[in-house]
């Protein structure tokens, strides 16, 4: 083993792995197909300003001045759900890992696709009616 390999190995051991964060990241990746579907199905060219972002630790949909954002807070090992409208921000939910499942602390329920739909509907109520 070279000196560089030994140094990297020591740094890796020092940094360690956060198994809870790892599982949370894996669960967060389960949102990829949903945000990917939005990116794919929304028109490439539109009369309205919009963007759909699907990163490993941050996902959001923004239409004009309104945004729904889900991101991982790595310090707390939670998923934060926020609504942004103009310069205002409202925290909609904190999602934690409970028994290897995503759990909504505010709603007191297991996270489901229906709850994600509720977040989208609540955020874009002015558009959806």
Write out the residue ranges for each language-model feature.
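Contiguous, amphipathic alpha-helical segments that mediate oligomerization or scaffolding
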Residues: 2-52
């Amino acid at each position: 083993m070279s000196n560089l390999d030994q140094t990297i190995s020591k740094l890796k051991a020092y940094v360690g792995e956060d198994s809870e964060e790892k599982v949370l990241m894996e669960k967060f990746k389960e949102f990829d197909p949903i945000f990917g579907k939005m990116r794919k199905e929304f028109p490439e060219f539109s009369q309205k300003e919009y963007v759909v972002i699907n990163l490993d630790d941050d996902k959001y949909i923004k239409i004009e001045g309104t945004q729904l954002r889900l991101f991982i807070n790595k310090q707390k090992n939670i998923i934060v759900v926020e609504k942004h409208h103009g310069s205002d921000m409202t925290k909609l939910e904190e999602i934690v890992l409970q028994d290897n499942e995503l759990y909504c602390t505010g709603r007191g329920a297991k996270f489901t696709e229906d709850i994600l739909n509720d977040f989208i509907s609540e955020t874009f109520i002015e558009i959806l009616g």
